[in-house]
């Protein structure tokens, strides 16, 4: 998935939105073969990663095409929250679906559940291929909407030459290797590398944390309720994406400056995770709420850093930079999750003590 972030982004450079969507739909194919053995499951997960990794660069580029700069973080936060909605819906839809197919004698139930869920990707691909058009050629976009979308290119204070230069900038082609010559590319790279691990650590390790510290197995009602609440809290990121627009409307700052101010605010909230473990001695709800807030802040921050790409690069290059940032975030997340697992194993084996905590809880406190 880390590598195919770049593949998907390169397809977007060529404006092959439909072709890229077809690649993303390969995730649906993967779902249908991940049902026989562990090895098939691993192979299917690889194919799924190839398909899903290209979706995000395409989504960011489409956001840049359909929204002015001041609204892009908000729109990004909305579609970014879609994965959270899916995570909330999965536990209450997929198991009943599997049980239904099992009850009517279709294998063990899970096989058909994989096929049905994977088939949704092809439906989405069809809608995308037949309905999506750029705003300037989309008959469903009226003149007023198009004027709003293109407001960044229609500044009355700019001369015709300046507007022409801005349009040329948006259409400028920058090769993949040339992107690495710009310090802005490395700013996005480092920003994603250093921060994506926060989200993926909490996403991956919170069920284990609930089990290790509080003894609630992931299939118990209490554990599922805690995870549901955590995901629900992260939905606050939608409102976080609105903050730059509010700052722009109230202060008149340019989109880039407003985004920097909003990102500084969001960057402070994950520090609350330092209190998750100590407060967890009183109730397991405290760490869940704190982790949810930290996750929401990270998602808001991430929506803004992706929107910053549109402030610094031409539209034709946005998908490439987003793909590079996604790759960096994947590498950083891999390092943090792998390192965390090793630390937790070491803490459990040695009964390590740290700041009043012993064993795995000590390891969790160090990572938090």
What feature does the model see in each segment?
Residues 177-242, 298-302, 306, 333-341:
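Extracytoplasmic gate region of multi-pass secondary transporters
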Residues 73-99, 230-238, 326-337:
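Glycine-rich segments within core transmembrane alpha-helices of 12-TM secondary carriers
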Residues 84-139:
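Helix-loop-helix hairpin linking two adjacent transmembrane segments in secondary transporters
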Residues 1-13:
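Single conserved hydrophobic/aromatic residue that forms the stacking wall/gate
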Residues 256-304:
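C-terminal transmembrane helical hairpin of 12-TM major facilitator-type secondary transporters
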Residues 93-105, 210-211, 243-244, 248, ...:
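Interfacial helix-cap and linker-helix signal at transmembrane-aqueous boundaries
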Residues 99-118, 219, 258-261, 342-368:
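A membrane-interface helix-boundary motif in multi-pass transporters
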Residues 44-82:
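Cytoplasmic helix-loop-helix junction between adjacent transmembrane helices
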């Amino acid at each position: 998935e880390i590598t195919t972030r770049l593949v998907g982004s390169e397809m977007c450079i060529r404006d092959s939105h439909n072709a890229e969507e077809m690649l993303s739909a390969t995730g649906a194919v993967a779902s249908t073969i991940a049902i026989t053995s562990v090895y098939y499951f691993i192979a299917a997960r690889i194919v799924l990663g190839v398909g899903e990794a290209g979706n995000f660069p395409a989504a960011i580029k489409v956001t840049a095409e359909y929204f002015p700069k001041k609204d892009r973080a908000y729109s990004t936060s909305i579609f970014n929250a879609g994965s959270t909605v899916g995570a909330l819906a999965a536990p209450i839809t997929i198991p009943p679906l599997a049980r239904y197919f099992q009850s009517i004698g279709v294998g063990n139930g899970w096989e058909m559940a994989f096929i049905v869920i994977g088939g949704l990707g092809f439906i989405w691909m069809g809608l995308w291929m037949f309905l999506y058009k750029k705003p300037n050629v989309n008959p469903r976009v009226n003149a007023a909407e198009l004027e709003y979308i293109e407001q960044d290119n229609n500044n009355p204070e700019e001369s015709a030459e300046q507007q022409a230069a801005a349009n040329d900038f948006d259409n400028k082609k920058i090769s993949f290797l040339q992107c690495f010559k710009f310090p802005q590319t490395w700013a996005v790279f480092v920003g994603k590398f250093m921060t994506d691990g926060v989200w993926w650590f909490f996403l991956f390790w919170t069920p284990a944390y609930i089990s290790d510290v509080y003894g609630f197995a992931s299939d118990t009602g209490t554990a599922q309720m805690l995870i549901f609440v955590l995901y629900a809290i992260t939905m606050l990121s939608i409102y976080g994406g609105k903050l730059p627009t509010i700052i722009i409307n109230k202060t008149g700052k340019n989109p880039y400056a407003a985004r920097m101010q909003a990102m500084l605010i969001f960057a402070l909230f994950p520090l609350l995770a330092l209190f998750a473990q100590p407060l967890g001695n009183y109730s397991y709800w405290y760490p869940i709420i704190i982790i949810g807030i930290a996750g929401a802040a990270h998602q808001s921050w991430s929506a803004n850093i992706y929107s910053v790409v549109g402030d610094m690069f031409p539209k034709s290059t946005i998908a490439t930079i987003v793909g590079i940032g996604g790759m960096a975030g994947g590498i950083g997340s891999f390092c943090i999750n792998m390192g965390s697992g090793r630390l937790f194993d070491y803490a459990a084996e040695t009964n390590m003590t740290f700041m009043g905590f012993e064993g795995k809880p000590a390891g969790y406190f160090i990572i938090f």
